């Protein structure tokens, strides 16, 4: 019996090689691995000894030889295969142990392109794929976590076909991930801004979550290794383990507050929707105003800031039940205060990269550019132009409605949401919902503004706004009844802006 071992990461490999040797396997290895195993007192044959051909091109070609791959791909249930390996003096290889050059790690070190290319493994993936293809006979190991249990089963002679299939699945997943990292790295390094006919998206599991969206669903967190920052890279400073829903809401929250790079803002998120968003002269004021916008929904919410949280703000945060607090930083007093709530998840967030958006549908995936453009052109389409104060509120509300589930309407005044209508199947219902929310918490709508993420198909919404004293509207435009809606605004003295850009969110 023969095993070939060629690994970059050496952890546990000496123990595995020794166990294989004790089971009667002859160990064949490549340069660095062979040297390491010999230092551990294990007898090893170099690949060049069995092929009769030396490593060439500074190690670029080591195992790409018929003696190696014939030994792996040999089918012991095919008579012609038996005749051929006997004819060519090829000995079967029964176990293949490989891990690959660390391209992913080297990518982050800022190497020159030519130096980085040296860490694209060629021989390793070829060995892995050959062994995995022939899993009926060959054992393939790519993960050190599998070494111990496989050895135990080999000792007992009860390694099943299902075990072999599992190891082959891991092997093909491993090479697919490796190639996915390389593929996406090329897009990033050479600014290849296109969606390919075929896409390989590398995903690496970070953790098993308690459950998915609901307790009966399994849930896992995977990261994209090509994105250096993002919610998966955030630092959890304290509290319970983040849940599936926490991650969804936290991601929505940080995307919203990122819309305000030059203003202090707080956003409170529930079920992937904002329930209160506000600007403030301080983080404390921003939080209090955001909470005031909907104090009922804020209970158990996710709170995000785009500025450092101080002790005074932390005291306000700990006065109510919250799931998660997210901010770019916290002062020492804030961390002391927040630590009083042992279960409260406190996260330090470093930002995110705009890449592309992926959504699962039955039988496939939808890929799209992320929605990063705020508007195409701001065009006043009514007789009256917005005042400076209205304009500030319109832009504030427009940024919020961009992150609200369709159909979405946001009512705002003085840099604070007064009412948010989200996820309704008609736009007028979203408006009514937002108005009812505002009235529920005692807000005066006179002088407030409205943002709608898509066009108003009829004038009915404008007539309702006028009755409430709302004075300005921002929307994309684009309806066949735009003129009817503009006329309604002019009748009521409402200023309206078209943005030329829609922000559906599903």
From Swiss-Prot:
Location of the MGS-like domain: 1-142
Keyword Zinc: no
Cellular component, GO annotation: cytosol
Pfam families xrefs: AICARFT_IMPCHas, MGS
Name by which UniProt lists this protein: Bifunctional purine biosynthesis protein PurH
EC number: 2.1.2.3, 3.5.4.10
Keywords: Hydrolase, Multifunctional enzyme, Purine biosynthesis, Transferase
PANTHER family: BIFUNCTIONAL PURINE BIOSYNTHESIS PROTEIN ATIC (PTHR11692:SF0), BIFUNCTIONAL PURINE BIOSYNTHESIS PROTEIN PURH (PTHR11692)
Coiled coil: none
Top-level taxon: Bacteria
Catalysed conversion reaction: (6R)-10-formyltetrahydrofolate + 5-amino-1-(5-phospho-beta-D-ribosyl)imidazole-4-carboxamide = 5-formamido-1-(5-phospho-D-ribosyl)imidazole-4-carboxamide + (6S)-5,6,7,8-tetrahydrofolate; IMP + H2O = 5-formamido-1-(5-phospho-D-ribosyl)imidazole-4-carboxamide
GO terms under biological process: 'de novo' IMP biosynthetic process
Stated family: Belongs to the PurH family.
Record note on domains: The IMP cyclohydrolase activity resides in the N-terminal region.
Cited NCBIfam families: PRK00881.1 (NF002049), purH (TIGR00355)
Single GO molecular function: phosphoribosylaminoimidazolecarboxamide formyltransferase activity
Species whose genome carries this gene: Aquifex aeolicus (strain VF5)
């Amino acid at each position: 019996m023969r095993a070939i071992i060629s690994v970059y990461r050496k952890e546990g490999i000496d123990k595995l090689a020794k166990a294989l040797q004790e089971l009667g396997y002859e160990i064949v290895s490549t340069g660095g691995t062979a040297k390491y195993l010999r230092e551990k007192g294990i007898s090893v044959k170099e690949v060049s000894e069995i092929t009769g051909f030396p490593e060439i091109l500074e190690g670029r070609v080591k195992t790409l030889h018929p003696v190696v791959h014939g030994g792996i791909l040999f089918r012991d249930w095919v008579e012609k295969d038996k005749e051929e390996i006997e004819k060519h003096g090829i000995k079967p290889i029964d176990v293949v142990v490989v891990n690959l050059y660390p391209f992913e790690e080297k990518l982050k070190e800022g190497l020159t392109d030519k130096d980085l290319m040296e860490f694209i493994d060629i021989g390793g993936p070829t060995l892995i794929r050959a062994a995995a293809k022939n899993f009926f006979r060959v054992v393939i190991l790519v993960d050190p976590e599998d070494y111990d249990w496989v050895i135990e089963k080999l000792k007992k002679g009860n390694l099943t076909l299902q075990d072999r299939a599992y190891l082959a699945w891991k092997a093909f997943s491993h090479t697919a991930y490796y190639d996915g990292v390389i593929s996406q790295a090329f897009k990033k390094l050479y600014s290849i801004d296109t969606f390919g006919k075929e896409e390989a998206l590398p995903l690496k599991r970070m953790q098993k979550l308690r459950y998915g969206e609901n307790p009966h669903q399994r849930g896992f967190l995977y990261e994209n290794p090509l994105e250096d920052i993002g919610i998966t890279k955030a630092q959890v400073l304290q509290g319970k383990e983040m849940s599936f829903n926490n991650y969804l809401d936290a991601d929505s929250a940080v995307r919203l507050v990122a819309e305000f790079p030059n203003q202090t803002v707080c956003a409170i998120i529930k079920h992937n929707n904002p329930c209160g968003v506000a600007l403030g002269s301080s983080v404390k004021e921003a939080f209090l105003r955001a909470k005031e916008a909907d104090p009922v929904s804020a209970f158990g919410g996710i709170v995000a800031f785009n500025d450092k949280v101080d002790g005074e703000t932390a005291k306000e945060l700990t006065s109510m039940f919250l799931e998660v607090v997210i901010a770019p930083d916290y002062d020492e007093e804030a961390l002391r205060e927040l630590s009083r709530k042992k279960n409260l998840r406190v996260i330090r967030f470093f930002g995110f990269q705009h890449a592309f958006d992926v959504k699962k549908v039955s039988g496939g995936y939808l890929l799209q550019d992320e929605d990063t453009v705020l508007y195409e052109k701001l065009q006043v389409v009514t007789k009256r132009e917005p005042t400076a104060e209205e304009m500030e509120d319109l832009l504030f509300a427009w940024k919020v409605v961009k992150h609200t589930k369709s159909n979405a309407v946001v009512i705002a005044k003085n840099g604070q949401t007064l009412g948010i209508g989200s996820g309704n199947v008609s736009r007028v219902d979203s408006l009514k919902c937002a108005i009812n929310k505002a009235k529920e918490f005692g807000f005066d709508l006179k002088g407030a503004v409205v943002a709608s993420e898509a066009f108003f198909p009829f004038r009915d919404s404008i007539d309702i706004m006028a009755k409430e004293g709302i004075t300005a509207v921002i929307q994309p435009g684009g309806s066949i009844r735009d003129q009817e809606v503009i006329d309604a605004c002019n009748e009521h003295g409402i200023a309206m802006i078209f943005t030329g850009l829609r922000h559906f969110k599903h």
